[in-house]
From Swiss-Prot:
One GO CC term, this protein: ribonucleoprotein complex
InterPro entries: Ribosomal_uL5, Ribosomal_uL5_bac-type, Ribosomal_uL5_C, Ribosomal_uL5_CS, Ribosomal_uL5_dom_sf, Ribosomal_uL5_N
Database matches in Pfam families: Ribosomal_L5 (PF00281), Ribosomal_L5_C (PF00673)
Subunit note: Part of the 50S ribosomal subunit; contacts the 5S rRNA.
Designated gene of the protein: rpl5
Name recorded for this polypeptide: Large ribosomal subunit protein uL5c
Subcellular location, record wording: Plastid, Chloroplast
Keywords, ordered alphabetically: Chloroplast, Plastid, Ribonucleoprotein, Ribosomal protein, RNA-binding, rRNA-binding
Primary localization class, coarse: plastid
Function according to Swiss-Prot or TrEMBL: Binds 5S rRNA, forms part of the central protuberance of the 50S subunit.
NCBIfam families: PRK00010.1
Family from the record: Belongs to the universal ribosomal protein uL5 family.
Length: 185
């Protein structure tokens, strides 16, 4: 079964992008390569229980288990030693990537209070888009009564685009609710 967002990409986004940017080859058409979800946990070095609950919540949201990221070097001011857990990272590809992006665009983002759209300034210069979320409660899979702490997360959408304008039109065609139209910085 083809994911709904992948079908939209194949039927609408790819032909639109090919026409807009005049690609000669179908392999030049930009596509989403992967989505990386990262959650930094400063308190994880002192509290192992928070690491477990954050791992459980992110696994429910993403649909796959995450990898614990560890400190590369010791920082005395943060009471941090080398190889202590400092966060969780999940990389999504293929169908799970399209399923997560579909839930993010259509279910999670509209549940944010006073949501006007995401900023179009989150592009990195190479067509990849970065988005920060302040809480995990916007995802319908998370039960409010079962969380111990509100945590934010960073979501990076990595594309094969060469420019930010290609990335903007790719995500806009897939339904990403941007606040404003794309303008070069």
């Amino acid at each position: 079964m083809v994911q709904r967002l992948k079908a939209i990409y194949l039927e609408k986004a790819a032909p639109r992008l090919r026409e807009m940017f005049e690609y000669k080859n179908v392999h030049q058409i930009p596509r989403i390569e992967k989505i990386i979800i990262n959650c930094g946990l400063g308190e994880a070095s002192q509290n192992a229980k928070s690491l477990d609950s954050a791992m459980k919540e992110l696994s429910i949201i993403a649909g796959q288990k995450g990898v614990i990221t560890r400190a590369k070097k010791a920082i005395a001011n943060f009471k941090l030693r080398k190889d202590m857990p400092v966060g969780i990272s999940i990389t999504l590809r293929g169908n799970s990537m399209y399923a997560f992006l579909d839930r993010l665009i259509n279910l999670a983002l509209p549940r944010i209070k006073d949501f006007q759209g995401v900023s179009s300034k989150g592009f990195d210069g190479h067509g990849n888009y970065n988005l920060g979320l302040k809480e995990q409660l916007m995802f319908p899979e998370i039960n409010f009564d079962q969380i111990d702490q509100i945590r934010g997360m960073d979501i990076s959408i990595v594309t094969t685009c060469n420019t930010d304008s290609e990335g903007f039109y790719l995500l806009e065609t897939l339904g990403m609710p941007f606040k404003e139209k794309f303008t070069k910085n």
